Design a protein with these regions (language model features):
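Hydrophobic, small-residue-rich transmembrane alpha-helices and their short perimembrane loops
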Residues: 1-69
């Protein structure tokens, strides 16, 4: 019974970690699109910063997945 409980707890923890990463990536994309809309000339710099932010958010999500399993 305790093994099943540990598996369920790990799955829930990894789901919350990945949910947070998905929300973070979505917010970064939203704000990057807004920033490009306000200042189209800086789209190159905004894109680079957005990709770095998305990579960090996804990295934390993957870390949560591995730590929970």
């Amino acid at each position: 019974m305790s093994i099943l409980l540990a598996e369920i707890t790990g799955n829930i923890a990894s789901a919350f970690g990945l949910l947070g990463a998905a929300i973070g990536v979505g917010l970064i994309g939203q704000k990057a699109a807004e920033a490009v809309g306000r200042n189209p000339g800086a789209s190159g710099k905004i894109l680079v910063q957005a990709i770095i932010g998305m990579a960090l958010a996804e990295g934390l999500g993957i870390l949560a997945l591995f730590l929970a399993k």
